[in-house]
């Protein structure tokens, strides 16, 4: 609903004070909201550099052209390089995205998500399928890259949620059973029963 992929049947959605209900996803993106998907979403045959560059071109209002030397645009080149440095994938810049490890693909997708300079970033299960070490690295990356932005994250791994969130809403079978600070959520008996299990007692 918020990102425009499903149109609301009632009510209104506001982003930075502006009504965005009914706008198309790319229009909402241009207004400052960017999101990732649970299923990795990128151009598998394009290189890491080209994937990020596409996102930067879109964000800066340039149209991608296969016959235009887009690398001649200094602001696009510099922004692309900065993002690759930020996500620690500069050394993989010439590798097709489809050949990256799963964890690297998720890191690339986070880079693509922030390329627009969005003030609101939505991430859907960003650590799903990762090892413990990969998850810790992803959480550190997300925390660093979303500093100064609003982060909305959907995640089943409660350690990830507690590591990133200032405020948490817990959803069970389509219903919010609790909302509050991480400490309030830790103490909530309904949350303990639904998610945290015996270790929370």
Feature locations, PLM:
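Glycine-rich phosphate-binding loops of nucleotide-dependent enzymes
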Residues: 1-201
